[in-house]
Amino acid sequence: SAALLDLETGEVHQEKQLLPVKAGEAGLRQSDAVFHHTRQLPELLERLRPFLAENPVCGVSVSTRPRNVDGSYMPCFLTGVGTARAVAAVTGVPLYETSHQVGHVLAALYSAGKLGACEKPFLAFHVSGGTTDSLYCEPDEQAALKITPCGTSLDLKAGQAIDRVGLMLGLQFPCGKALEQLAMQSRKPFRIKPVIRGVDCCLSGLENQCRKKLEQGEPPADIARFCLMTVAETVIAMTKAAQERHGKLPVLYAGGVMSN
C-alpha cells in the first residue's frame, strides 16, 4: 500500500492491492512476498502521481520492520525501504522510519478521529495474521509513539487461526471476511473458555477444536461462529489482564482481524 497526505487539508489519497495467493494456500513464502511487493509497489505509486501535480513532496515515511523490537525482520520490508529511500533522495526530503505495528496503531487512531490519544498513555491491541499483541503505548517525541509489548499469543496468532479454519471450511485466503459472513448464518450459543497465561494467550487449541467439530459433522456456519467467538473472548480476557497490570487505561483495537 502507498498513500499521500496533504498537510494543509488533511486529505489522504491511498492505493492498496492484496498480494496474490494461490487457492488453498495459507499465505506466501517470503521470497514470493518480496517478488510481489517489488512488482506491485511501482504500480501503486504511479496511480498516486496525478495528486502530486500541484503539491511538492515534503517528506517520506516507511515501515522498515514488523515491530519496534530487536530482531523484528521480514525481507519484504526491504522493498518499501528501498523505494522510500530512492524517493527521498531524488526529492531531497527527510525520510522517517517507523514500524508496521506503529503504523497500524496510528492508522486506527486516525480513522477513529482520536489522534489526540497519543498525548497520554493508552493500551492497544494489534490483532492480525502475524500478531496477537497487547501493547502499552505512550507519547514519544522522536517516534510519535513508544510501544512496549505487554501480552501476546504464545503459539498460533488470531489471524492464522481464522485462516486455517477458513481453509478447513473451503474458503479462500485471506478468510476473515468470508468466515464472518458464514458465522452470521449461525445463532448457536457456545460457552467459550479462552486459554490465558497471565497477560498472554494460547490459540493453537482452537484449530484442533474446529477440526474435531468438522469431523463430527457440525455445520460450517456453527464452526465459523465458534472460531470468531473464541478469538473475541480471548481478546476480551487479554484486555482485562492488560488493564489489571497497567490500570484502567483507554483501549484501542487495530489490525486486520479486528475488522471481523
Walk through the language-model features, giving the residues of each.
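Short glycine-rich, Thr/Ser-proximal phosphate-binding strand/loop in the N-terminal lobe
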Residues: 1-35, 143-149
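Gly/Thr-rich phosphate-binding beta-strand-loop-beta motif of the actin/hexokinase/Hsp70
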Residues: 1-12, 119-138
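Short, well-ordered amphipathic alpha-helical segments that serve as non-catalytic structural scaffolds
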Residues: 16-18, 36-51, 234-239
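Short beta-strand-loop/turn "lid" adjacent to the catalytic site in phosphate-handling enzymes
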Residues: 46, 50-85, 89
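Glycine-rich beta-strand-to-loop/alpha-helix junction loops that act as flexible
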Residues: 62-65, 87, 128, 252-259
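Conserved phosphate-binding catalytic cores of ATP/NTP-utilizing and phosphoryl-transfer enzymes
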Residues: 93-123
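Glycine-rich phosphate-binding loop plus the immediately following alpha-helix
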Residues: 99-102, 137-185, 208, 212-217
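A contiguous, well-structured pocket-lining segment that forms one wall/lid of small-molecule binding clefts
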Residues: 177, 181-251, 257-260
